Design a protein with these regions (language model features):
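N-terminal secretory signal peptides that target proteins for export/translocation
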Residues: 1-9
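Bacterial N-terminal signal peptides
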Residues: 10-23
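Residues embedded in well-ordered secondary-structure elements
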Residues: 15, 58, 145-147, 268, ...
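Extracellular zinc-dependent metalloprotease catalytic-domain scaffold
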Residues: 26-182, 187-288
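Short, composition-biased motifs enriched in small/polar/acidic residues
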Residues: 288-368
Length: 368
């Protein structure tokens, strides 16, 4: 989903279209920071980045549930983050019926059209699926408490010394804390494959694991596995390399960095996209991104400065430009970008925005 605001800028007079709308949010994620984080000299930055990730999910999903997560630091070499979670076995027929009752989006409709009715799951043919505690509540099944320490739905470990703690300054040799937190939150909420557990009764995301020919696949052999709602549109490629999570995205060759990648790309700052579709499909209620408002536009020489509000916390916005408003948006040129913190306010500076040969130039603000 993309959120776009357009405005036109002439040489003399800037005109902005201000559109602000915010859907009511209901998902609540309650973090607990253990002493390894609170005693860290960079605790304030670490906690702020974690809270930015949490606010992102609370803004994008409307499920009226509370999810509790314990955050702690780890020192395992080569590992940026990990998560622990608790699941229960429930019947496939119950899970599918609850997905049907909870369906709210086009993703849900398409996914359900390709999940057969009946008692047998389409992956292994057994009558069972494994569903994590947060995911159970998202589809309306309450009372199944986590057996993790403190009763948390998840415990997330973060190797903060190997991560860029904020996006204000990027060390190209480190991973991204925000994306790492989002990766692990996705797994606490329900993403993962039970291929990591040796196979057997699947986790919900395994119901959407297809080969490139459109057949369901549930094997660690080969390198042909994709996340898809229908077996036709291949949304993301699953990792098939042993030693990395089979529920993560493929990184064995050239690829565009994503949050759920099996191996993070140092220096990159991916935001959740395909991961949101996956969470929507397994039972969460995805909301449109909030529409940002442009509160002020100023021109300093040829430099355009945009100030806005109501941006998506944890989101990255692009400024696109064209001299012809009728040009398809995918043909506009990206000229500036910025990351939005927890308060939703943002400032984006566009260099060389205008020149004396143009009567007008159009700009669009797009959520990356």
């Amino acid at each position: 989903m993309k959120t776009i605001s357009k405005f036109v800028f002439g040489r003399l007079l800037p005109v902005a279209i201000l559109i602000t709308a915010m859907s009511a949010q209901a998902l609540v994620i309650v973090p607990t920071f253990d002493s390894s984080i609170t005693s860290d000299p960079n605790a304030a930055t670490i906690e702020s980045t974690i809270n930015t990730a949490i606010q992102f999910y609370e803004t994008r999903f409307s499920d009226p549930i509370t999810v509790t997560i314990l955050f702690q630091e780890i020192t395992t070499s080569g590992l940026y983050g990990h998560s622990s979670w608790w699941y229960y076995n429930i019947s496939y027929s119950t899970y599918r019926a609850d997905l049907q009752a909870d369906a709210t989006t086009a993703n849900d409709t398409l996914a359900l059209a390709h999940l057969p009715t009946g008692s047998a799951n389409p992956v292994t043919g057994s009558n069972t699926v494994r569903v994590k505690t947060a995911n159970l509540r998202a589809i309306g099944i309450n009372g199944d408490n986590s057996g993790l320490a403190g009763g948390h739905d998840g415990i997330i470990g973060l190797h903060t010394s190997q991560l860029n703690l904020s996006r204000a300054s990027i060390n190209p040799g480190k991973g991204d804390l925000l994306a790492t937190v989002e990766h692990e939150i996705d797994e606490v909420l329900g993403l993962s494959s039970w291929l990591d557990g040796g196979g057997g009764d699947p986790l919900p995301e395994d119901l959407f694991r297809y080969s490139s020919t459109g057949a369901r696949t549930y094997t660690t052999s080969g390198d042909d596995a994709y996340f898809s709602l229908d077996g036709v549109t291949l949304i993301a490629r699953f990792n098939q390399t042993a030693g990395s999570d089979y529920g993560d995205w493929w990184t064995a060759g050239a690829h565009t960095p994503q949050v759920q990648d099996a191996n993070a790309t140092n220096g990159s700052t991916p935001d959740p996209k395909n991961e949101l579709i996956a969470l929507d499909a397994i039972g969460y209620n995805l909301l449109p991104a909030p529409r940002p408002g442009i509160s002020r536009i100023t021109l300093n020489g040829t430099q355009l400065v945009l100030k806005g509000t109501n941006g998506l916390a944890g989101g990255t916005y692009l400024v696109l430009t064209s001299t012809n408003a009728a040009t398809p948006l995918n043909q506009w040129t990206a000229v500036a970008t910025n990351f939005v913190g927890t308060n939703g306010n943002f400032t984006i500076t566009v260099p060389n925005a205008v020149n004396s040969t143009e009567a007008k130039r159009f700009f669009a603000l797009e959520l990356q």
